[in-house]
Amino acid sequence: MNGIVSRLSALSKAGLGLAAGALALIILNLALPGSSLFFPLVSLWLDLALFLLALVVLRVAGVELDLFHRAVLAGVWAAALLYAFWALGSRTFVYHWDYANYILKQYSTEAAFLQGAGVGFRFVFDSITEDYTNFISLFTEFPFCLSGKTGDDYAFCQVFSILPTLLVLLAGLVLKAGQMLRVKNRFWYFLMGLGWCITYPWLRMSAMLGQPDWFGLIFAFSILLLTLDFRFEKLDPVRFVLLFSATAAIILSRRWYLYFVVGYYFSYALLVLVSSIRTARAGHRHPAFVQLRNLMLFGLVSLAAMVVLLWPIVRHILSFDYADRYSYYNGGGMVTEIYQQYARMGLMNLVLIGMGLWYSLKTRKMPALPCLAGLEILLSMLLFTRVQTTGSQHMLLFLPGWFLLFLLGAAALAEGITRRRNLKIGFWLFTIVFATSVRCSPLTLVALPDFLIGRTVLSASPQESARDFAAIDDLTYDRKDLPQIQAIAKWIDTHCAEGEISYMIPHNMLYCPDHFKNCLLPETPINAKLAFGFSVPGVHAFPMQFFEAKYVLTADPFPMAHVNDPENEMSHKLNDLFLAVRDQYFKQVETFDMGNGTTFTIWERTAAPTRAEVDYYLSGFAQEDALYPEMFSQVAEAWLTGHGL
């Protein structure tokens, strides 16, 4: 037996170890159902299994990490650890909106697994049709379970649970592109290529804000590694299983990665088709036929299997009009999106890409690579902008294409490193330092470090001047009003008994209910005592909890910080309606000075809601009601009927 084990490869031994671990987890669950150890150990097992699968992907792709590569990766991971510790420790950020979704889901998934393994896995499975699934929660529990479980802890723990696997696959992608480009100076190419990719601000942006969406890039990079130089010359079952699994996993991680999947596979199929045509023209018709046959066979079987496996997601996509419901987030279509893509790239990265394209054209090395990357980016952009304009987290779905273009630039510099060596190394180091210093804020629109925020018109949004934008960015990224926010949260907790609620009208980046709900994480004492809020047409339903609330909170001046569409944003409309009739139904009971020019006022309801009051507020949203009656008048009528009004 020992002889058999000794003859196994390292990957095979690791696989046996994982199998033994899975058996131990089954025994633990049977012996101690609902154990608090089960979910963290499952998460650790999944992280190790995913890392092992990443190594399998590298082997199938024909990529090997030698001692030099492994040493560089260890150094990069250590630097990332220090960076995350510094970046998270140098700010006071209150997790809200999308930035709080994952940590709250992590709490909920933990609670589900404490009820038993079956309950926990069912909780994860039942979420697959939601915009935010619980799939990633399976991988981020360890080592989060060992931390203080704050929002910053959740962001920091991704360096352990996600980054190692992501780094290995990114390094593999760098090497694979280098193989295809036949780079001779592999030392500088690897350092430059990996350095530019790993320090690109939008790779880490969402992670530093509590959104582990970069988890999906593990599977995106796997797809690239398995396809870039594969032309379906033969049937490769192992490669096909890995491709199918990576595609399913990336869709489960975040549904909007579908735009990458569709854009990339279409571009890749076109590349294989062109390759087959060229092969046929060269007189090799049978190999060309085999390529197309294998491509179609894999594509059709995979598509059918994917529809069956992910039918709940497919059904939800087909039945839900995202373009209509998310129209508020569509801030200008393709023209705006192109501008944002270039703004997020930054001048130096655009120069780098330009050098890579010139290098590819000049040397005629792998013209298919920039064509594949460019077409994937363009198609994904066209598909995405039919629904909305990208936020910082959505930038991740374009990174595989952009990174391929980065690597072209790295190859161009590395191959000519002997000429103007110091200048080129200086350019590389400067861009890395500049990229590392970029502020990871919800309002970061352009890749600029702290000292340039507000000092250039490039940082201004369409709604604010550069100076105002910088002020808002400072207020939201590094909160100086946390004591006041916590004071209001404690006031609500004290004055609202079980079953009673408060309603907060402001709902924007500066102040929204989530700031007050999540200001004491991991404790959420007012989660059931403060209503969610109301702001986005097509997403937020008419707020009947406003009429049920014991207290209503508003602010003066009313916050309208960096809202997407000021004219159609709904919280300020609700506030205007409230101020016009507040004295008929409410009395002022408390005020809070937030220390930044904003004052919160708390109003207590003194008169029971009536049909006339509901109709008055509903009349202020006639336009929205005409578009979404099921979210306005129908909701109001059902509430009135249920309350005998």
Where are these regions (language model features)?
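Transmembrane-helix motifs of polytopic, lipid-linked glycan transferases
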Residues: V56-V60, F156-K184, S222, M355-K362
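Short acidic/glycine- and proline-prone juxtamembrane loop motifs at membrane-interface regions
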Residues: W202-F215, G391-S392
